[in-house]
């Protein structure tokens, strides 16, 4: 049945929310939903995870993958921190590399790391006389251009910085263009989301809408995606959806703000759940029967969060009947 309800049911299955993933399936899921992010407002250094999707402790698992340098850190979506498989670094460098605009401080640090690295920020401060507030933005500029690499393999503060090509000698950050990289990653995301709009993909990857829309149109021209409603479906899923009714996910899950389901369509969702009260914001979104239909409003703190209200987009009677179920999820 080619309906949004069946699409949603298949999406929940592909996200491993209907049935949790073992290690091999989890690795494929993580790859398709990369760059992986930490839980929003997490403790410093916590490994990335995909909440409620693994049949094991994926925070511990991804921490181990970080220590083995299977997962590595970079600055990806809008300069934000994320973690990708080291084997995928060239692809994501092509997707996110920003043109390098040298400054006096960035060139000084680049030369110093090349000569003396790996170095931590404290050593750079001591050797250059620069302040941390001068060093950090210069390192971020170099990191976004994939010229240096921050080796965060555990939760410690004392992290070494290397020249990128020293850590990844076989990776050419300029080999893959952004347009080509989008043609590779968008089918992965579409496979997991099943139904994907250009706006969803733009929010997920944090890239210009024009670039994302052009890539999706090209994938449709190639027959990899097909147009449906306001977005696209993977072409291979159309007969599957027409022939099979998938079991829907029933229940309520609380999703943190970096969850992949939240990141798709995040811009519109932020507007819809904007609180008129100063100091109140979304702390979690509520996935109700496979669709985001509510949010927990409050204020983040170190320690227990403030909880102000629970907003729901449900009929009043249904919300009343499911009150305890919703509160348990929160």
Which positions does each model-derived feature cover?
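Long, charged, low-complexity, helical-prone intrinsically disordered regions
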Residues: 1-330
């Amino acid at each position: 049945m080619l309906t949004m309800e069946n699409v949603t049911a298949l999406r929940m299955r592909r996200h491993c929310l209907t049935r949790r993933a073992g290690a091999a399936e989890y690795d494929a899921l993580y790859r398709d939903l990369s760059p992986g992010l930490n839980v929003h407002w997490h403790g410093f250094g916590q490994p990335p995870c995909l909440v409620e999707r693994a049949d094991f402790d994926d925070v511990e698992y991804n921490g181990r993958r970080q220590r083995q340098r299977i997962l590595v850190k970079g600055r990806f979506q809008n300069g934000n921190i994320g973690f990708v498989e080291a084997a995928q670094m060239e692809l994501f460098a092509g997707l996110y590399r920003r043109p390098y605009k040298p400054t006096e401080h960035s060139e000084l640090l680049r030369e110093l790391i090349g000569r003396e690295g790996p170095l931590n920020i404290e050593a750079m401060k001591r050797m250059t006389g620069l302040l941390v507030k001068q060093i950090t933005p210069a390192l971020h500029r170099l990191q976004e251009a994939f010229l240096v690499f921050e080796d965060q393999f555990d939760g410690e503060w004392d992290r070494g910085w290397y020249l990128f090509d020293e850590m990844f000698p076989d990776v050419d950050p300029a080999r893959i263009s952004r347009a080509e990289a989008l043609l590779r990653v968008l089918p992965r995301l579409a496979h997991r989301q099943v139904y994907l709009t250009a706006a969803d993909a733009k929010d997920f990857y944090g890239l210009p809408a024009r670039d994302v829309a052009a890539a999706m149109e090209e994938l449709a021209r190639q027959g990899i995606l097909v147009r449906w409603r306001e977005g696209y479906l993977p072409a291979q899923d159309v007969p599957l959806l027409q022939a099979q009714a998938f079991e829907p996910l029933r229940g309520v899950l609380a999703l943190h703000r970096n969850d992949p389901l939240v990141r798709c369509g995040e811009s519109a969702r932020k507007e819809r759940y904007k609180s008129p009260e100063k100091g109140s914001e979304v702390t979690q979104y509520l996935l109700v029967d496979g669709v985001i239909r509510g949010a927990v409003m409050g204020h983040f703190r170190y320690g227990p969060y403030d909880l102000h209200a629970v907003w729901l987009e449900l009929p009043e009677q249904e919300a009343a009947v499911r009150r305890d179920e919703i509160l348990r999820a929160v």
